[in-house]
Structure formats: C-alpha cells, structure tokens
A protein has these predicted regions:
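Feature captures the catalytic ectodomains and active-site-proximal regions of enzymes
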Residues: 1-315
Length: 315
C-alpha cells in the first residue's frame, strides 16, 4: 500500500502531511522523524523516509531525523553508508540528521525498558555522546567491534557546540517504521503511557505512525490505516466454536497473536494464550535455546488436556 502510493504519486497528497505542516506553522514547532534507517524492508525502508521529507518540503527547515541503525536485516556494518546517503539527501532536500542509536535500544519488544530508556533520553533530552560527525563515531564503534545494532546514543552538535535539536511538547513526531511490533514500546512512552518507574512519561501529543501500531493507542495517529482482514484462520476457528491456543515466549508472542490474527490485538472467542518470558540476556547467542524448554513444558501440559482443536506455537 505504501509503495503503491509512492509509485502513483499519492503519498505526498496524504491529508496527514497537510495537517502536520499546518500544525508546525501554527505552533512554530519542529517535526521529528524517528525510525530504522535501512533498506532491509522488514521494519522500514529508507525510501519511505525520503518520501516523508519530500512531503514536508514546505517546512523542511523544521525537520530533524532520529535514526536507528540496523545491523540485523542488513549487513552489520552498513549503517555508515545509510547515514551518508541520508545526509547527502538532506543536504539537497532539507531535514537534518540529529541523533543516531542502535535498534537494540530503540526497537526492543520484550519489555526491556532500560533499553528503551536510552532511546527515550536521546530523543527527548539529547542525552548521548556529542559529535560533529556521525560517520567518525560509527567508524570508531566498528573498530571496537560494536556493530550497527548496538551503536550507543549519538547527538549532533551545531557550530556553537550545542545539540541541533531540542524536543518540545508542541513538536510533532513521525515514526516511519511500517511494522508495528518493534515500534510500540518507544511510541507508548513518548506519547501514550506513563512509565515513571523507569523515568519515562509521555511528552508529545501530536504523534504519527506510518501504520497502525496498536489499536489501543489513543494519541498515536496512523498515516496509513490498517485494513481489517476478515475470515483469518483464527476467526474461522472461533466461528466454528473450536477452542484454540496461542503460545510463545515474549520475543515471539506478537507473531502468534497480533500478526496471526491479521492485525487484531484482542483474542477471538474461545482463543486462549500462554506467554512464557524470554530470558533476560543481552543477546540471545548467550542463551540460544531461549525459553524453548518452558514453552515445551507448557504445550505438553495443554495437549494432554485435550481441550484445544487448534494450537499455534512459535519457539
């Protein structure tokens, strides 16, 4: 849908961009674009970011970009190339790269709020290593065997030695990831949910996501609204009065629930769910079995009950 709108020259005609420009002018406020900077095509695409910048060309001097380096869906040391590509594009078309951080922190989906906090502090408070050149910092990270996924927070300085951006309550944020699962946590603390126990609270009310991240979100507005799918397998099973079970560990939980149900977060009637916590390790190569044993124990127990006519499991 997004790519088609670009190809048919309809992307920049979206009313949401008109609203964002109008809001920015009315409030004399900035626009912050946040998301994964790569062309991996799993969570985001750099071409979408470019189109957003072009769509906001009327206020291009107000655009600041907060990039998450990838390293998982693309080469682990390709982030420097994407950053240089973006900086060249911005020089010609407007916008300015303001902060950089690895997706390990900004795109957690397993309730590791201490990771999200790093991204939150970077975007909201400019808390990170100060630099005048992102490429030099990333080269140094590579030299220290720290690849794109794990890039520590970086903040661009202006000619006066101050961070080039300062997020204010009247600003706008656009999260340009199109896949929802790794965008929810950061979105929630920036505009939806108070996480004071982790030092985070909502600070932006004018918040947009490229697609719908969570139907429970009240403030985050999707630019491309979800198409509600009918007669998914889970719905058909439910309509036939068959009990069904969804089971996975937290890292894979959205795949057997939200995604499997065609974008519906709420369980169908007679659908039950079991969530096993994923291990609390820095990276899963330290515990490659993850929570397979716990998932197995749970599923054996449920199978022996002979209650469910359908089981969806993800190790």
């Amino acid at each position: 849908k997004i790519n088609n709108s670009i190809e048919t020259d309809n992307f920049h005609k979206k009313k949401e961009f008109e609203d964002i420009i109008s809001y920015s002018r009315k409030n004399s406020s900035n626009i912050h674009l946040i998301g994964l900077l790569s062309d991996g095509g799993v969570h985001s695409h750099i071409d979408h970011l470019k189109e957003i910048i072009l769509s906001l060309s009327d206020v291009k001097e107000k655009i600041f970009i907060h990039a998450f380096t990838d390293g998982r869906d693309v080469d682990p040391k390709s982030g420097i190339n994407y950053i240089q590509t973006l900086e060249d594009f911005c020089e010609q078309n407007g916008g300015e790269l303001s902060t950089v951080i690895g997706r390990y922190y900004a795109m957690d989906r397993d309730n590791r709020w201490e990771r999200i906090h790093k991204a939150y502090d970077l975007i909201s408070n400019g808390k990170g290593k100060k630099t005048e050149n992102f490429s030099n910092e990333i080269k140094e990270s590579y030299a220290n065997n720290k690849t794109d996924e794990f890039i520590e927070p970086l903040v661009k300085l202006n000619k006066n030695g101050n961070p080039i951006h300062q997020l204010k309550p009247d600003d706008t944020i656009i999260f340009f990831n199109y896949r929802s699962d790794r965008g929810r946590q950061l979105t929630s603390v920036l505009c939806e949910e108070n996480k004071s126990e982790f030092g985070m609270r909502p600070i932006i009310s004018n918040f947009y996501t490229l697609t719908e991240y969570d139907e429970k979100f009240k403030k985050a507005k999707p630019i491309f609204k979800s198409k509600k799918l009918k007669n998914t397998l889970g719905e058909v099973i439910s309509n036939n009065n068959i009990f069904q079970l969804r089971i996975a560990e937290t890292e894979k939980y959205p795949h057997v629930t939200f995604f499997f149900n065609g974008g519906y977060e709420v369980p169908f009637e007679k659908e039950e769910r079991i969530l096993c916590p994923s291990p609390k390790v820095a990276t899963y190569d330290l515990k490659p079995e993850m929570s397979a044993a716990e998932v197995t124990d749970n599923i054996i127990n449920e199978i022996n009950k002979e209650k469910f006519g359908f089981i969806c499991l993800n190790f």
